[in-house]
Amino acid sequence: MDAEFWNNRFAAPQYIYGEAPNAFVAEMASQIPPGPVLCLAEGEGRNAVHLATLGHRVTAVDQSEAGLAKARRLAAARGVKI
């Protein structure tokens, strides 16, 4: 799947996978030591934003600019920066 596929998929205003982190990230977040976190293939940002709300310095990367734009909006709505 390429960037065009994901840009089309993330073009809708709603968050395809929701705004809450996935179960794995929610369960394991407390095990991540303080500091920088790199979130690869982050999509719409739900995991990155969750980690940022816990105080991590998060860099989110994805091939979809549409997904990253939604991630930035979600981060702003939660008062964090990714």
Placement of each model-derived feature along the sequence:
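Conserved class I S-adenosyl-L-methionine
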Residues: 1-32, 35-43
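Conserved SAM-binding loop of SAM-dependent methyltransferases across substrates and taxa
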Residues: 44-56
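Conserved SAM-binding loop
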Residues: 71-72
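Conserved SAM-binding strand-loop segment of SAM-dependent methyltransferases
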Residues: 78-82
